[in-house]
Amino acid sequence: MDPILALADIHLGRKQSGDKKIGPGLAWALDALDQGAKAGARHLIMAGDIIDRKRFTEATYGEVNQFFEHALSLFDTVLFTSGNHDTHHNLDLPAGVTVASPSPATYLMGSCAVHTAGVEVDKDPRELVGSFPLLIDGTVNLGILHTSLTG
């Protein structure tokens, strides 16, 4: 199986210290991408909440694009599955980023079949695992849901 780096809940826009809710920040996120690639990951899954729902500025949208542009330079495949915070934004992601549908679907990442669905609305009430696509024989099957979805 081709190694996959999976990240979630980066919450770009949050301060890195001094607030009740903090985030790791862009420098950490870019370093995490570099470290994943250095460790041999060939694919990236960003499993939701790349940006914070409340704590963001216009510059944060540039940070989101910088994150994904850097990911595209490092990985063969970049898959973004939206999280509950992402639903509050109209993200215009760089060409080459695959954005997961809110309906359960399968995306091939090398020799791995990734079954996922993006969050549709904040506080998404759906239970999706039962409607996930069937396993694909002869490959590794990986199911990914953002933490705000249940199955």
Give the location of each predicted region.
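N-terminal active-site segment of His-dependent metallophosphoesterases
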Residues: 1-63
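His/Asp/Glu-rich metal-coordinating catalytic cores
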Residues: 43, 54-151
